[in-house]
Amino acid sequence: MQKLLRPFYDRATLTVAKDLLGTYLVHDVAGERRIGRIVEVEAYLGSHDRASHSSKGRTARNAVMFGPPGHAYVYLIYGMYCCMNVVTEAQDHGAAVLVRALAPVANIPLRTQGPGLLCKAMQIDRRLNGHDLTGDTLFIAMPADRPAVRIAARPRIGVAYAGEWAEKPLRFYIQDDPFVSRK
């Protein structure tokens, strides 16, 4: 497998979102390498996207979204679950891709269908907010044998507050994959 480098992330968010499907999320934890194949993502296109955390401008919570591409934006939801996003596009754009589900590949003992569950299984928490994904402990890699995938597009989950943006088909997943959180 080959680690994804900064130019991969410094592209249009929709392109990055679709290209992440089938790649490996890798986290080295206490001498153990956890690997999951990304099977579901959601694109958040920037400050004009009403469902995006960046839609109301830069805050202490979402500042990482406005930073350079290729960093992890990790935040807490419901006071108990972490979610991991991949920052995309140019600095100050405020765009990211939420990793929603993984298919376990190595050393993942828990369920990974849903952003909170996958963060728990991969031991990703807020301490990794801002982590450079081109580093050595938490990164995304292209598998040597990545097969072509059929991509399905649906509306994002849990963004009913976002008006017309709630219905845009910005959730992408590998069609017929059993580890997708919701069809």
Segments predicted by a language model, with ranges:
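Conserved, well-structured core segments that form or line functional sites
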Residues: M1-K183
